[in-house]
Amino acid sequence: MASGLPRFLQALPAEHGPEPLRTRVQEPDLQQWGLTGIRLRSYQLEGVNWLVQCFHCQNGCILGDEMGLGKTCQTIALLIYLVGRLNDEGPFLVLCPLSVLSNWKEEMERFAPGLSCVTYTGDKEERARLQQDLRQESGFHVLLTTYEICLKDASFLKSFSWSVLAVDEAHRLKNQSSLLHRTLSEFSAVFRLLLTGTPIQNSLRELYSLLCVVEPDLFCREQVEDFVQRYQDIEKESKSASELHRLLQPFLLRRVKAQVATELPKKTEVVVYHGMSALQKKYYKAILMKDLDAFENETAKKVKLQNILTQLRKCVDHPYLFDGVEPEPFEVGEHLIEASGKLHLLDRLLAFLYSGGHRVLLFSQMTHMLDILQDYMDYRGYSYERVDGSVRGEERHLAIKNFGNQPIFVFLLSTRAGGVGMNLTAADTVIFVDSDFNPQNDLQAAARAHRIGQNKSVKVIRLIGRDTVEEIVYRKAASKLQLTNMVIEGGHFTPGAQKPSAEADFQLSEILKFGLDKLLSSEGSSMEDIDLKSILGETKDGQWTPDALPAAAAAGGGSLEPEEGSELESRSYENHMYLFEGRDYSKEPSKEDRKSFEQLVNLQKTLLEKTSHGGRTLRNKGSVLIPGLAEGPIKRKKILSPEELEDRRKKRQEAAAKRKRLMEEKRKEKEEAEHRKKMAWWESNGYQSFCLSSEDSELEDLEGGDESSAELAYEDLDSTSINYVSGDVTHPQAGEEDAVIVHCVDDSGRWGRGGLFTALEVRSAEPRKIYELAGKMEDLSLGDVLLFPIDDKESRDKGQDLLALVVAQHRDRTNVLSGIKMAALEEGLKKIFLAAKKKKASVHLPRIGHATKGFNWYGTERLIRKHLATRGIPTYIYYFPRSKARHSQPASSSSAPLVP
């Protein structure tokens, strides 16, 4: 080819396509090299072989399988191949959103335990320590981190020569001007792999941006316009389409569930319409009239119009999203449900689903709407978990775990925070309270339930306000999704128009007028009850009946939407749900809509003129001047008397106290239910806990008298009540009495190495076995004490040696260990006192935390003295002797000489 052609054309492969691998990778090979805990499906094994081929051809690539088909496990299998077959020790860098970081870590541990994986997270100080460790010890295979930390510590990560750079949820890179895109282009990587369930969302430009990451030499930044211009008319030019297929074939693999996961249960989407309450209608009109200037010049007022659209969407969700609308004293009641047509429908929908034994993922765009839904869940007594953008990684993981392991009815999620990477197949019903402008976000959210591992049919229910902007937003999203499906199909890039459709030129000011004719036809509520069974279909034994389609979906207020990839999806939209009475509302507002809007505007202007001529000036033209509110004099805020203020204060206090009491009762009920479930689980596994009961220590607190007077008494006691000795605490210097050895552990259930951990393992096989089993059975909480004998290998002639493991440290999911938590240590010492008192035993401790920088030994010593020594328990603190080391007396115990 001529040298003047763009680089991507110079690298165009031959007509016959890429040469196949001489030797295919088989699953037994991967198992031999270290793959465990999974049986790859045939299409996943094909994907692994395709990735291997790309690696050998030195092509970066995009694995664009639909959400839920196992892109993570295919990537891990590739890394296993590189290490096991090619002896490529990496390092490999994996970038992903924070929301799926724990999932990546768990699947690395599960599928590739032979690969060492470092999770690079934490605050600045923690990451600095990790950087030092990684520089000193480079023997890791995989470094796992998030986009945000990659940007913060780009200079450190650039210092490595990565064998593989893998980016999960890679549609984050669709803009080649973004900081992350520019940063990753500076990384040194032999092979670049992008994972995304949505390889193209809007345009050829976005696709080129991804190609620019995987093969920057072929798809250079400067030639994006050449790419767009060459292929923008591929729908008309079959030669260009064929050329584009060949160009993309080495770089892009895309499979959808309908093609490869035929055993996956069916997914059906149903659109259910709802009316509006009178309160919602009132505010809907008021929002439209708040800023009339915005409708005069759309180009200049686009931001204002977008704000109006957002406010209208909030109004359709719930009027309480606006300050000052909810009536005082802010007590949850039926008014919360009746104020919103959407929540009125959702209330009946959830009751229907609950009685049928279904479990629900409930998505909303707005976290404030999730707040209202959370109040509603508490009011109705439904069990739920919640995840949104404010929920930290550890809490997010716990919520997902709880939903998977417990019969929780609803999982509340924000679409963008909860729509990425989560596996929530315990749910069989997905409800979208409102729709995203980008349909790919909704698709990803629905894929949390409809994915590999789901064994039930999935029903996706979308709630849309009738005759509101929600209708036109959803229609535009559906059109956008149809365009995307034309662009990429069956693993190839296929002909599809990339020019904006007619709707893209649709004026925003026109969107806001949609449906006004019918919406404003009456002032009253348009909410009504509908037959949910006829709309949603049959349900039996907690499962949707896959073969029974709803009989009255379209007629009864609902509309069936086809599953992605089905034949229905490619049909004409001529009979779409937006075609009412022969008029296509998806194209533009009707004449009646425009007429109703003009009437509103004229009325608003008349009211403004009357108010102005009446001698009053408006401080804010955005005042809510609508029929029913503007008639008569403007109502002033009532000035309350001191008695009325006091009465209101008391009512608010009573309401707050009642809410607090109800929340406490529900919390206790939930804890009791969880405890009963855990006891049943333990019994089914034959597990017996070694934890000391906390009831006796709580009783001891009640009987212990005045703490302050006790503290004063301790000051007068001789410090020799603690015996300081030199020796090995695992072989206590005891007489004929029982001896309790104390050791502090964390709540992870992973036994440590070195120091006292190793010494205890030499002494007995029980500590590691009992501690790790307690971790597996979720029997390790801060403040717990595991007490058990350790005389299995050696014993004294008289008296028994026991080990008390105090859970006093927390290890988070990124393997960061906290310091010793004094409250947990104190709780543990209380329990040890009662056990030692009953057994008439002595207590033997190492110098807890002596190697920890900044550890409060003085406070620890006081706790030991307070709860053990001064209460009659023989207490010994051991200093381990080391060669050529002289043991000096601790400053806090100057009168206690050490035994040499």
Swiss-Prot record:
Adopts an inactive conformation in absence of DNA damage. Binding to poly-ADP-ribosylated histones activates the ATP-dependent chromatin remodeler activity. InterPro entries: ALC1, Helicase_ATP-bd, Helicase_C-like, Macro_dom, Macro_dom-like, P-loop_NTPase, SNF2-like_sf, SNF2/RAD54-like_C. Its EC number is 3.6.4.-. GO terms for molecular function: ATP binding; ATP hydrolysis activity; ATP-dependent chromatin remodeler activity; DNA helicase activity; histone reader activity; nucleosome binding; nucleotide binding; poly-ADP-D-ribose modification-dependent protein binding. The modification Phosphoserine is found at S534, S612, S623, S641, S894. It is an enzyme of class 3 (hydrolase). A motif (DEAH box) lies at residues 168-171. Keywords: ATP-binding, Chromosome, Coiled coil, DNA damage, DNA repair, Hydrolase, Nucleotide-binding, Nucleus, Phosphoprotein. It is found in: Nucleus; Chromosome. Its main location: nucleus. Residues 606-640 are annotated as: Regulatory linker segment (RLS). Residues 52-217 form the Helicase ATP-binding domain. Residues 546-569, 641-673 are annotated as: Disordered. GO terms for cellular component: nucleoplasm; nucleus; site of double-strand break. GO terms for biological process: chromatin remodeling; DNA damage response; DNA repair. Residues 620-678 are annotated as: Required for ATPase activity. Residues 643-680 form a coiled coil. ATP-dependent chromatin remodeler that mediates chromatin-remodeling following DNA damage. Recruited to DNA damage sites through interaction with poly-ADP-ribose: specifically recognizes and binds histones that are poly-ADP-ribosylated on serine residues in response to DNA damage. Poly-ADP-ribose-binding activates the ATP-dependent chromatin remodeler activity, thereby regulating chromatin during DNA repair. Catalyzes nucleosome sliding away from DNA breaks in an ATP-dependent manner. Chromatin remodeling activity promotes PARP2 removal from chromatin. This is Chromodomain-helicase-DNA-binding protein 1-like. It comes from Mus musculus. The lineage of its organism: Eukaryota, Metazoa, Chordata, Craniata, Vertebrata. The gene is Chd1l.
